[in-house]
Amino acid sequence: MKKYAINILVILFLLTPFTLFANGCHANNDTIKVLAIGNSFSQDAVEQYLHELGEAEGITMIIGNMFIGGCSLERHVQNIRNNAPAYAYRKVEKDGEKTETRSMTIEKALADEKWDYISVQQASPLSGIYDKIGRAHV
């Protein structure tokens, strides 16, 4: 049963789109909560720029960023399987204050907030290579 649940989580991570502002998906003033599971590129793109874009539009956001430099989808899957405490977890609160926790598991980060959006990032050299995505399955 645990393996089945992990398989479902991995599939959901891989299929979750990362579109926050398209087509008016933010119809009210609630806080949007975004979790990125990625590598060093998610630091700038998610932690800094996304928070600033939301702020400029008057959208309150909480952003979580789980990252390992150069991490591939395959490694993310292994970390999910093993509940590995392999990530640095940076969190940007509503007011923009940042905190960092080392040796974090994906399981703990998922439980930290009721995330609205979750993105999983492939390592840059492997991005767009379909065969590399196929190998990441559970």
Model-derived regions, located:
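N-terminal beta-loop-helix "entrance" segment that forms/cooperates
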Residues: I68-R90
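Bacterial N-terminal signal peptides that target proteins for export
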Residues: M1-L9
